Each structure stands twice: as structure tokens, then as C-alpha cells.
Amino acid sequence: MTSLSRPRVEFISTILQTVLNLGLLCLGLILVVFLGKETVHLADVLFAPEQASKYELVEGLVVYFLYFEFIALIVKYFQSGFHFPLRYFVYIGITAIVRLIIVDHKSPLDVLIYSAAILLLVITLWLCNSKRLKRE
């Protein structure tokens, strides 16, 4: 196998980085549209008189924060020189598990396992923010 010349490798890297950036830009725009739709849905649920709408409102709020966190992750990617900070993924994981507990809380054992997963993610977040591992 022949090795590629340095300019050719940099050209391929630039092309792939551009494709990745365009893809993330499109994903960010799609998430903004979904965030707008979720805002309208939350407004509808807020004024619904049913008791079940309260659970739907809480679930909708957590989904709203998930959209918001993904958009913030994409913004941070562009601001930090095309790098995804690990702690943002941990935040998203914690929020997603909280949503899962809210939606599916029938089995106490499952809730306990989900809570242990949140504890593990919080410990991970603490380690990521420690002085030894902090990069930003």
C-alpha cells in the first residue's frame, strides 16, 4: 500500500471535516425546528384540563431540555474548534435517563437501576471536571 503525500492527506481531511460540519449544521437546524414544535406542544399541554396532561407536561419539558442540550452541544463543537466536550454527552445521558424514569416508572427495580446509572454518570462528570482531566 502506498502512502499518501502530506498535501493529499490534508485535502482529504479538509473535505471530510467540511462534510461533517455541514451535516452537524443541518442536524442543528432540524433540532431547532423540533424545539419549536415541542414549544407549541408544551403550550397546548399546559392549558389542557386533564390530569394526565401534567405527566405529559413534565415529560415534554425533559424532552425540551434534551433538544436544547443537543443544540448546545453542536454550538460548543463549533466554538471549541471542532471538538465535542465529554461532559456535554454526560449531561445528555443524565437528562435522558431522568426522562426514562419519568416515562417508565412501573418497576421499582428498573428505577433503582436507572438511578444507579445516573449516580455513575454524576461520578463521571465529577471526574471529568476534576483538575487532572479538565481541558477547557
Curated annotation (Swiss-Prot):
GO cellular-component term (any): plasma membrane
Alphabetically ordered keywords of this record: Cell inner membrane, Cell membrane, Membrane, Transmembrane, Transmembrane helix
Subcellular location: Cell inner membrane
Membrane topology: Multi-pass membrane protein
One of the Pfam families matching this protein, by short name: PsiE
GO terms, biological process: cellular response to phosphate starvation
Keyword Amino-acid biosynthesis listed: no
Residues that span the membrane, as ranges: 15-35, 55-75, 82-102, 108-128
First-listed, main subcellular location of the protein, grouped into a coarse class: membrane
NCBIfam families: PRK02833.1-2, PRK02833.1-3, PRK02833.1-5
Record family assignment: Belongs to the PsiE family.
Protein name, UniProt field: Protein PsiE
